[in-house]
Amino acid sequence: MNKSALLSPAPFGRLLTAMVTPFDDEGKVDYGLAADLANYLVDQGSDGIVVCGTTGESPTLSWQEQQKLLETVRNSLGSRAKVLAGTGSNSTSEAIEATKEAANSGADGALVVVPYYNKPPQEGLEVHFRAIANAAPKLPLMLYNIPGRTGCSISPSIVSKLMDCSNVVSFKAASGTTEEVTQLRNYCGSDLAIYSGDDALVLPMLSVGAVGVVSVASHLVAPNLKKLIESFLEGKYSEALYLHETLQPLFKSLFATTNPIPVKAALQLIGWSVGPPRSPLVSLNSEMKEELVKILSSLRLI
């Protein structure tokens, strides 16, 4: 088994939660609840919080809401945990503006997704990310590859070129395969901190060189995920495998439909009134909710 995760940096810790954005009964961002939820997630074991990412419904948040949400979480957590801001856009100029604002607001890093919809070629991706890195040179960046949502994928060779920017330090791998991690390791070595972007693949990705996970399930089972990662790093592979297998039904249910629909429903079930997603996303249907209740009950979460 590859122990390269032991040799790689983990600049944002091992377990990061891609936090949902709570909405009140009128559909407005509930900033007070966001602060409470962020602190709860850290109490449960999260080393870092990602705000305004995919799970945080960034496409339906205004720039003003995103900025206030980042400032709220940053101020609430203080030095208790790392705070990363989702600053990606399919417009380079907008991504630059958002990343600079994140740096000015005290973020510990920025999660910058591959541009979506306009499907730039690899040369365009290099220009895009290099411009962002150069615009906020002191802010550590986590590049984010999720081709199922963006329609294109950044190649490991381009990532390796971008590493001459000193603030390109990490990568969220959400292509759904361990091969992506292997190729990134081949091109970039151990200096790039690779995080799994898929809860179901945490253990497989750790085994080929990832250092941790940007998780959705950690809203619910952070201690279990923390233990899984620690068990792997300590060489307790049977224990890590047991946790991996035990949590698979939950992982599957949280992605039975578009994220963050299921995790918001799950949070409601365990007592967090985070509200439904904003349109065009909808609430979890009754059949999926019934299955989610069974899984949460089996894990003694409700």
Swiss-Prot record:
Its main location: cytoplasm. GO terms for cellular component: cytosol. It is found in: Cytoplasm. CDD domains: DHDPS (cd00950). Pyruvate binds at T55, V214. The keyword Lyase applies. Keywords: Amino-acid biosynthesis, Cytoplasm, Diaminopimelate biosynthesis, Lyase, Lysine biosynthesis, Schiff base. Its EC number is 4.3.3.7. The active site is at Y144, K172. It catalyses: L-aspartate 4-semialdehyde + pyruvate = (2S,4S)-4-hydroxy-2,3,4,5-tetrahydrodipicolinate + H2O + H(+). GO terms for biological process: diaminopimelate biosynthetic process; lysine biosynthetic process via diaminopimelate. Pathway: Amino-acid biosynthesis; L-lysine biosynthesis via DAP pathway; (S)-tetrahydrodipicolinate from L-aspartate: step 3/4. The record marks T54, Y117 as: Part of a proton relay during catalysis. One of its GO terms (molecular function) is 4-hydroxy-tetrahydrodipicolinate synthase activity. SMART domains: DHDPS (SM01130). Pfam families: DHDPS. Disulfide bonds: none annotated. Belongs to the DapA family. Catalyzes the condensation of (S)-aspartate-beta-semialdehyde [(S)-ASA] and pyruvate to 4-hydroxy-tetrahydrodipicolinate (HTPA). Homotetramer; dimer of dimers. This is 4-hydroxy-tetrahydrodipicolinate synthase. It comes from Prochlorococcus marinus (strain NATL2A).
